[in-house]
Amino acid sequence: MPRANEIKKGMVLNYNGKLLIVKDIDIQSPSARGAATLYKMRFSDVRTGQKVEERFKGDDILDTITLTRRFVDFSYVDGNEYVFMDKEDYTPYTFTKDQIEEELLFMPEGGMPDMQVLTWDGQLLALELPQTVDLEIVETAPGIKGASASARSKPATLSTGVVIQVPEYLSAGEKIRVHIAERRYMGRAE
């Protein structure tokens, strides 16, 4: 089992009975001699999506696990269940609407490329989306000419129903690229 100073972003830990994906690591070096370096790690709970923060000393032993990641395509909706199909062996993976509520906010009709399901020991854990998605603005205040010089923003409703802040010069009908985790406008879609 690795020490805390060997943990990298994207690894999965089994800690206090929870499966946690490492999202970010801050290294804090103490100024006093002999004091241990601290590793402040931010996690996302694989099962609940809840954000968790923990501190470890560099020589703390941590229990890492290996998740199986499979690329999937969205297949169909059956009542309250969303079915995804493995791209290689066509295994169906089923999630309830509650399990993937956050992901559905960014998933265009028909799905999107590079979606993955995470499994561990045969147990379905989570649906993972790519970092960005291209969506169309369906409703926002009209674009203001000459507003590109200002950094002001306005709310915009996207084709999936999610509302994010966009620059003032954008108008309805334009396709934009959105950073999913941060719910942030990144630029116009190509």
From Swiss-Prot:
Single GO BP term: peptide biosynthetic process
Organism this protein belongs to: Cronobacter sakazakii (strain ATCC BAA-894)
Gene Ontology annotations for the cellular component aspect, listed alphabetically: cytosol
Annotated protein name in UniProt: Elongation factor P-like protein
Molecular-function annotations in GO: translation elongation factor activity
InterPro entries: Elong-fact-P_C (IPR015365), NA-bd_OB-fold (IPR012340), Rib_uL2_dom2 (IPR014722), Transl_elong_fac_P/YeiP (IPR020599), Transl_elong_KOW-like (IPR013185), Transl_elong_p-like_YeiP (IPR011897), Transl_elong_P/YeiP_cen (IPR001059), Transl_elong_P/YeiP_CS (IPR013852)
UniProt record similarity statement: Belongs to the elongation factor P family.
